[in-house]
């Protein structure tokens, strides 16, 4: 059971939303900026959610840079693409910084009882404006090195990592939130470049989850990756050996319209191999699925509960206030270094 992750409309849980959260197919909740005014309000909201569904996986997109949902009362995490330039190309220094920023991002969320950030971005920085500096670099080896360090920092705080957007979103100009991106490159290029960060981090056991792209790679497969059993079952599961959780990207995005209405999208994503599907910014769409979709009878083979934090590790990390404070100063230092270049 529990194949669906949904969201909330505002700063607290309405009665209708509470009923949805109690549905056995709901296993996750993603928070957005509209759900946040302050750290204190966020903690109260999470407590309200936990009273309704104590075990639910609470997630957020909190990568740093322009994709950071909570700001007031949180450290502003630099964009991942700013780390190596701020270190003036010193990879050893940049890796240390990436580790501390991963720790900082994770511990500030875990301190508010939020389980997961959908991070890091493993796309290569190419022509995609929606990716841009969300990516560590245009170079696969640099992405691998910095992402690995960032993930290790997250793990030291007790949080698992979700790599996105498999097999790579960086080489399409279109934004899948509002359009259907098509990557016309040959499969050989994708496998020799974009997929390398995913491959390497899976091989080294660093990824607990992966989110595929709503991108079509027609030279490889006619379906968007998130609706493609070739990409998810053949490549990701079989060839790369990934045994973590596969999250769909938001089924409300334009890039998901390929599969029809919400029922069609949910079926296509689950049939392709997703373990949990996200439906955001559309409560009627959620209700359509909860009331009108025939869900799989069996539980997900890779349940999203695998992404729950390592609470013993988190407890230790919360005691390390000196590391937390030093990481805050580092984040500010990197931000200032990049502002000075503008």
Swiss-Prot record:
InterPro entries: Beta_hexosaminidase_bac, Glyco_hydro_3_AS, Glyco_hydro_3_N, Glyco_hydro_3_N_sf, Glycoside_hydrolase_SF, NagZ_Beta-hexosaminidase. Pfam families: Glyco_hydro_3. GO terms for cellular component: cytosol. Substrate binds at residues 61, 69, 134, 164-165. It catalyses: Hydrolysis of terminal non-reducing N-acetyl-D-hexosamine residues in N-acetyl-beta-D-hexosaminides. Pathway: Cell wall biogenesis; peptidoglycan recycling. One of its GO terms (biological process) is cell wall organization. Plays a role in peptidoglycan recycling by cleaving the terminal beta-1,4-linked N-acetylglucosamine (GlcNAc) from peptide-linked peptidoglycan fragments, giving rise to free GlcNAc, anhydro-N-acetylmuramic acid and anhydro-N-acetylmuramic acid-linked peptides. PANTHER family: BETA-HEXOSAMINIDASE, BETA-HEXOSAMINIDASE-RELATED. This is Beta-hexosaminidase. It comes from Shewanella oneidensis (strain ATCC 700550 / JCM 31522 / CIP 106686 / LMG 19005 / NCIMB 14063 / MR-1).
